[in-house]
Amino acid sequence: MPIDTATKQKIIAEYATKEGDTGSPEVQVALLTHRINQLTEHLKEHKHDHHSRRGLLLLVGRRRRLLQYVAKKDINRYRRLIERLGLRR
């Protein structure tokens, strides 16, 4: 499920560290979190959609690796990010 352009731009603007920032780990994690939330809602309705479930697991793994990278580089930045996203860690 792709993210529509308006939503994507809003997320990028909210989590960007500077103007024109689309690739920072914060932005990437925020976009992945949005996609994960969408897929989670989809799977609540379509419980037997195993292809989407695998995609969800891949997205969660990618987000976990990015969060580990941020935590390794700057622990305060990591804590702010998970607090803003409402992730439980």
UniProtKB/Swiss-Prot annotation:
Gene3D superfamilies: 6.10.250.3130, S15/NS1, RNA-binding (1.10.287.10). The keyword Transport does not apply. InterPro entries: Ribosomal_uS15, Ribosomal_uS15_bac-type, uS15_NS1_RNA-bd_sf. GO terms for biological process: translation. Disulfide bonds: none annotated. Keywords: Ribonucleoprotein, Ribosomal protein, RNA-binding, rRNA-binding. One of its GO terms (cellular component) is cytosolic small ribosomal subunit. Belongs to the universal ribosomal protein uS15 family. Part of the 30S ribosomal subunit. Forms a bridge to the 50S subunit in the 70S ribosome, contacting the 23S rRNA. PANTHER family: RIBOSOMAL PROTEIN S15, BACTERIAL AND ORGANELLAR (PTHR23321), SMALL RIBOSOMAL SUBUNIT PROTEIN US15M (PTHR23321:SF26). One of the primary rRNA binding proteins, it binds directly to 16S rRNA where it helps nucleate assembly of the platform of the 30S subunit by binding and bridging several RNA helices of the 16S rRNA. This is Small ribosomal subunit protein uS15. It comes from Thermobifida fusca (strain YX). The lineage of its organism: Bacteria, Bacillati, Actinomycetota, Actinomycetes, Streptosporangiales.
